[in-house]
């Protein structure tokens, strides 16, 4: 298989603070990965480096056969879709939904004297329709609910027809119904034969949609587990990743985790050892 992403011995520090330590990670074509860990584990930092939004302090990063440091990232970014609350925060409340989606064609937030052709308009409408958001096309961004915004953000991330798609905690802040609708949409995208390779950042196993194939778990900036989902999402690995005894269950394509009584703490120590 062809590698779409390869991180080799990647580290990142800010002053004396080590954020990532010697991260190795390879994503092959057709794989869909979950980046899992607690708050501050380094998930979003790894995703930002892997999506060419941040340079590491050391190590090498190859994205879509281009090496960071040797490529103009402004030319690479349109090939990489990104759903992030940080991007959404930059959208003006008065911006129309159609404009939010269309502007991704130019790799910017908001419109700035762009002219869109019929292909762009048709694609934007088709994506919104496929995600159950066609009725929002003329609404202003500031009037949307959290669930509606996520669907529009996903349409925007898919607008350039990316080769990779990064989803940074897409279900954060959503109610149960909105979360399940979003996860179902992601599963449908994955099932398409021309789906981009996806990377989902989360700290909840319950937010992993059906169809994801692999997981990379992080703790304090270091890799704990990496590989096929069923091999990584075990009680031992997840307990070590989150630093407490956890039970992991799997039912009808979905994972869940819950805490175990304090007496099971020895299990975490053994997993670390």
Predicted features along the sequence, with ranges:
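Conserved ABC transporter NBD signature motif
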Residues: 59-69
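Catalytic Walker B motif of ABC-type/P-loop ATPase nucleotide-binding domains
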Residues: 165-169
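Helix-to-loop junction immediately C-terminal to a conserved catalytic motif
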Residues: 51
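Conserved ABC ATPase signature
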Residues: 115, 140-144, 148
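Conserved structural motif at the start of ABC-family nucleotide-binding domains
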Residues: 5, 19-22, 137
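ABC ATPase NBD coupling module
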Residues: 67-81, 114-117
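Conserved ABC ATPase "signature" region
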Residues: 117-136
């Amino acid at each position: 298989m062809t590698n779409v992403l390869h991180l080799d011995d990647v580290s990142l520090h800010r002053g004396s603070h080590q954020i990532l330590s010697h991260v190795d990670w390879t994503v092959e074509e057709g794989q869909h990965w979950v980046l899992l860990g607690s708050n501050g584990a380094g998930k979003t930092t790894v995703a930002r480096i892997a999506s060419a939004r941040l340079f590491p302090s050391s190590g090498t990063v190859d994205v879509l056969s281009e090496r960071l440091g040797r490529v103009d990232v402004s030319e690479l970014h349109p090939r990489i879709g990104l759903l992030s609350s940080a991007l959404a925060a930059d959208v003006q409340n008065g911006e129309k939904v159609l404009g939010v989606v269309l502007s991704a064609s130019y790799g910017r937030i908001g419109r700035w004297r762009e002219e869109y052709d019929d292909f762009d308009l048709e694609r934007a409408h088709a994506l919104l329709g496929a995600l159950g958001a066609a009725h929002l096309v003329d609404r202003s961004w500031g009037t949307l609910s959290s669930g509606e915004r996520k669907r529009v953000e996903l349409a925007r991330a898919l607008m350039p027809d990316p080769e990779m798609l990064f989803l940074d905690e897409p279900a954060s802040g959503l109610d149960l119904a909105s979360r399940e609708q979003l996860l179902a949409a992601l599963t449908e995208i994955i099932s398409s034969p021309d789906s981009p390779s996806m990377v989902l950042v989360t700290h909840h196993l319950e937010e992993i949609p059906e169809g994801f194939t692999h997981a990379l778990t992080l703790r304090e900036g270091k890799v704990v587990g990496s590989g096929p989902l069923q091999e990584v999402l075990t009680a031992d690995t997840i307990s070590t990743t989150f630093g407490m005894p956890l039970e992991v269950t799997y039912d009808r394509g979905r994972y869940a985790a819950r805490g175990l009584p304090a007496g099971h703490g020895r299990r975490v120590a053994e997993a670390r050892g």
